[in-house]
A protein has these predicted regions:
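Conserved glycine-rich beta-strand-loop-beta hairpin in the small C-terminal domain of fold type I
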Residues: 274, 290-299, 311-324
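PLP-dependent enzyme catalytic core of the Aspartate aminotransferase-like
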Residues: 337-346, 352-385
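N-terminal small-domain helix-loop-helix segment of the aminotransferase-like
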Residues: 2-95, 102, 276-277, 385
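Active-site phosphate-binding strand-loop segment of PLP-dependent enzymes
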Residues: 140-210
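Active-site PLP attachment segment
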Residues: 217-252, 265, 359
């Protein structure tokens, strides 16, 4: 079956955060949203069919994950993550941000230091502070157009931390951390008794030519979170999975989750995830090929129309990191041009790690190519004016 990712679907009026929160978040609703990290593609037909079939029963009582669900999850992890997990090593989580918050509350104490590498997904900056922990940032370097970890700085700071929250692949920009990098992280963190929490929500979206390596295959001493939400565009269903190989850590954290009643999810989270993992291979392959062409389109466009923009192109997922500092504009001038002249809503780089990133913006290219090209054209016209 050939899937149509060029189809334009009007998401407005569905309480869609990406489109319907524009007025509240940006002060105007007449802009193209290229911010929130979900895609504007139709959710797969086999997922929608499974949900409709479950609805047809017309009794939506308390539910539990079926054996079919666990089988689909474990088979997917083995095929795509090279993780041979037992059901006992896995735990359902209603969302990865919530899962990380649970881990911090369960496994650390108020005041403990939590390490992140910036720029990074904004909740990683907020979770430690909001839970009474101390945030520690190790800035990434950009070398040859991709993010790299400054391991000298990383180890100096890790020595005094209890937890490292890692985005693997990295958000923003979808940098894929290879085996060598992950092994070095594991060595440093085990040396200093730092727990690694690996958010791998973008892992399935690793683009052709790159290979995702799960932290769970490098070390048994960490917590790995995965989800079908980004992969199959079903983030609104709240479905993710936690994997822990180490028995002592697993018993402590999973026992805490069970005490909170976290094991239960909504009916459609289980139904959709099972269908996605069991039937989603071909859809995912075609979608990744489409995203890869979107990345190439962005790269060509920037070279031709906005050569002063420095970009970190995604190796996984659909999020690019754009640095407009070459235009000599202030943060406020850039925001005005992008929002009010180009009429495009991007993620402000300062939310990923502070004023150091005031000329940077994250762009979501998980959309039909015609929308991407139109938005880029308007950005170029505004910036080059």
């Amino acid at each position: 079956m050939q899937y149509n990712f060029d189809e334009i679907i009007d998401r407005r009026g569905t309480d869609c955060f990406k489109w319907d929160a524009l007025q509240a978040m940006y002060g105007r609703g007449d802009v193209t949203p290229m911010w929130v990290a979900d895609m504007d593609f139709r959710s797969p037909d086999f997922v929608m069919e499974a949900i409709r079939h479950r609805c047809d029963h017309e009794v939506l009582g308390y539910t539990m994950p079926s054996e079919g669900y666990w089988q689909a999850v474990t088979m997917w992890l083995e095929k795509h993550y090279n993780i041979q997990a037992t059901k006992q090593e896995l735990h359902f989580i209603p969302g990865i941000v919530a899962g990380i918050a649970y881990a911090l509350l369960c496994l650390t104490q108020p005041g403990d230091r939590v390490l992140v590498t910036t720029p990074v997904y904004p909740p990683f900056l907020n979770l430690p502070k909001d839970s009474g922990r101390t945030l520690v940032c190790s800035p990434l370097r950009i070398t040859n157009g991709r993010f790299e970890i400054d391991f000298d700085d990383f180890e100096r700071k890790a020595e005094h931390c209890k937890v490292f929250i890692m985005s693997n692949p990295h958000n923003p920009a979808g940098t894929v951390w290879g085996t060598e990098v992950l092994t070095k992280i594991a060595d440093i963190c085990e040396k200093h008794n730092v727990l690694v929490i690996s958010d791998e929500i973008h892992a399935d979206l690793t683009l052709p030519g790159h290979q995702h390596v799960s932290y769970g295959t490098v070390s048994s001493k960490g917590i790995t979170f995965m989800a079908p939400s980004k992969t199959f565009n079903i983030a609104g269903l709240g479905s993710s999975v936690c994997y822990i190989a180490d028995e002592a850590l697993r018993k402590r954290f999973f026992g805490w989750l069970d005490a909170l009643g976290v094991a239960g999810g909504n009916i459609f989270a289980f139904t959709a995830a099972e269908a996605a993992f069991a039937q989603g291979g071909e859809w995912l392959q075609q979608m990744l090929e489409y995203l890869s062409e979107n990345v190439k389109t962005l790269d060509r466009f920037l070279q031709e129309r906005m050569p002063k923009v420095k970009v970190v192109l995604p190796e996984a997922s659909y999020l690019a990191w754009l640095d407009f500092s070459g235009y000599g504009l202030t943060h406020e001038q850039l925001k005005h041009k992008l929002l009010n002249e180009a009429k495009v809503a991007l993620n402000d780089g300062t939310t990923f790690g502070g004023d150091k990133y005031e000329c940077c913006f994250r762009l979501n290219l998980g959309c039909p190519r015609s929308i991407l090209i139109d938005a880029l054209s308007r950005i170029a016209d505004a910036i080059n004016e």
